[in-house]
Amino acid sequence: MERGMTDIETAETPATHSGFVALIGAPNAGKSTLVNQLVGAKVSIVTHKVQTTRAIVRGIATHDNAQIVFVDTPGIFKPKRRLDTAMVTTAWGGAKDADIVLLLIDAERGIRGDADAILERLKDVRQPMALILNKVDRVKHETLLALSAAANEKVPFKRTFMVSALTGSGCKDLLDYLAQALPAGPWYYPEDQISDLPMRQLAAEITREKLYLRLHQELPYSSHIETEKWEEKPDGSVRIDQTIYVERDSQKKIVLGHKGETIRAIGQAARMEIAGILEQKVHLFLFVKVRENWGDDPERYREMGLEFPH
């Protein structure tokens, strides 16, 4: 008996989808926590201090046949100084370049202040937009419905999602939507890559997180951390030297702490987390230097991935 042209039945491979999704919102709405939850790994630092995210951090999630590149932007607020202006400009730039824009609103805080101002400006955005209400586990259902209606009255959102960035509730529905809404096309990054942030920069971000968590009240966020040295050792360990730049001597004393206790605690917490990510032993050395008005130095902005506002 004659066979057909082939013994193997071929099924058409599903088309891959990929694209950039900008996550915008007011400071401390939970953007970084949500990106980490959606990616399934830590790609953005999280603290209780407002404006922790300074530059755009891309977290990469693979869901079904789609690669979703999340752009975690700085919180949008009314800028008061040069660094603030650079961060807000960066945030809107991230939204302008994205395929889809997600607005994250803290459901506990509702629409007021910065969130209301963002909604007004979103009226001029042409990309598809979706609304995400965060911390829904802490708010009554009737309040959530009223909040959703008020936001959708101002801006024509394609979809509204109710999530808890902390627990992950509602995140699968959001990923399902993004996977089918992004354009068909090849993936931008290898399948196992979860961020495009260089490891030297991520290590500095982790130390900055530990600094803020330890000194939440005492230290203003006008501090900056640079990874000055990264040396792979023959025994498989790595030596990392980082400098914490502050603007005044009084801030340096706070970071050092009594007999160096504070900086040791910060270093230990950062070293453990960096070692966990690298899966190798880490020798972390922290130094504190005063650099007055570093916030007016264009070179520092370039290192943070920000455009220096003139």
UniProtKB/Swiss-Prot annotation:
<dbReference type="InterPro" id="IPR005225">
    <property type="entry name" value="Small_GTP-bd"/>
</dbReference>
<dbReference type="GO" id="GO:0070181">
    <property type="term" value="F:small ribosomal subunit rRNA binding"/>
</dbReference>
<dbReference type="InterPro" id="IPR027417">
    <property type="entry name" value="P-loop_NTPase"/>
</dbReference>
<dbReference type="Pfam" id="PF07650">
    <property type="entry name" value="KH_2"/>
</dbReference>
<keyword id="KW-0342">GTP-binding</keyword>
<keyword id="KW-0997">Cell inner membrane</keyword>
<dbReference type="InterPro" id="IPR005662">
    <property type="entry name" value="GTPase_Era-like"/>
</dbReference>
<keyword id="KW-0547">Nucleotide-binding</keyword>
<keyword id="KW-0690">Ribosome biogenesis</keyword>
<keyword id="KW-1003">Cell membrane</keyword>
<feature type="region of interest" description="G3">
    <location>
        <begin position="72"/>
        <end position="75"/>
    </location>
</feature>
<feature type="region of interest" description="G2">
    <location>
        <begin position="51"/>
        <end position="55"/>
    </location>
</feature>
<keyword id="KW-0963">Cytoplasm</keyword>
<dbReference type="InterPro" id="IPR009019">
    <property type="entry name" value="KH_sf_prok-type"/>
</dbReference>
<dbReference type="GO" id="GO:0043024">
    <property type="term" value="F:ribosomal small subunit binding"/>
</dbReference>
<keyword id="KW-0699">rRNA-binding</keyword>
<feature type="region of interest" description="G5">
    <location>
        <begin position="163"/>
        <end position="165"/>
    </location>
</feature>
<dbReference type="GO" id="GO:0005829">
    <property type="term" value="C:cytosol"/>
</dbReference>
<feature type="domain" description="Era-type G">
    <location>
        <begin position="17"/>
        <end position="184"/>
    </location>
</feature>
<comment type="subunit">
    <text>Monomer.</text>
</comment>
<comment type="similarity">
    <text>Belongs to the TRAFAC class TrmE-Era-EngA-EngB-Septin-like GTPase superfamily. Era GTPase family.</text>
</comment>
<feature type="binding site">
    <location>
        <begin position="72"/>
        <end position="76"/>
    </location>
    <ligand>
        <name>GTP</name>
    </ligand>
</feature>
<feature type="binding site">
    <location>
        <begin position="25"/>
        <end position="32"/>
    </location>
    <ligand>
        <name>GTP</name>
    </ligand>
</feature>
<dbReference type="GO" id="GO:0005525">
    <property type="term" value="F:GTP binding"/>
</dbReference>
<dbReference type="InterPro" id="IPR030388">
    <property type="entry name" value="G_ERA_dom"/>
</dbReference>
<feature type="region of interest" description="G1">
    <location>
        <begin position="25"/>
        <end position="32"/>
    </location>
</feature>
<dbReference type="GO" id="GO:0003924">
    <property type="term" value="F:GTPase activity"/>
</dbReference>
<dbReference type="Pfam" id="PF01926">
    <property type="entry name" value="MMR_HSR1"/>
</dbReference>
<feature type="domain" description="KH type-2">
    <location>
        <begin position="215"/>
        <end position="292"/>
    </location>
</feature>
<dbReference type="InterPro" id="IPR015946">
    <property type="entry name" value="KH_dom-like_a/b"/>
</dbReference>
<protein>
    <recommendedName>
        <fullName>GTPase Era</fullName>
    </recommendedName>
</protein>
<dbReference type="GO" id="GO:0005886">
    <property type="term" value="C:plasma membrane"/>
</dbReference>
<comment type="function">
    <text>An essential GTPase that binds both GDP and GTP, with rapid nucleotide exchange. Plays a role in 16S rRNA processing and 30S ribosomal subunit biogenesis and possibly also in cell cycle regulation and energy metabolism.</text>
</comment>
<dbReference type="InterPro" id="IPR006073">
    <property type="entry name" value="GTP-bd"/>
</dbReference>
<keyword id="KW-0472">Membrane</keyword>
<feature type="region of interest" description="G4">
    <location>
        <begin position="134"/>
        <end position="137"/>
    </location>
</feature>
<dbReference type="InterPro" id="IPR004044">
    <property type="entry name" value="KH_dom_type_2"/>
</dbReference>
<keyword id="KW-0694">RNA-binding</keyword>
<dbReference type="GO" id="GO:0000028">
    <property type="term" value="P:ribosomal small subunit assembly"/>
</dbReference>
<feature type="binding site">
    <location>
        <begin position="134"/>
        <end position="137"/>
    </location>
    <ligand>
        <name>GTP</name>
    </ligand>
</feature>
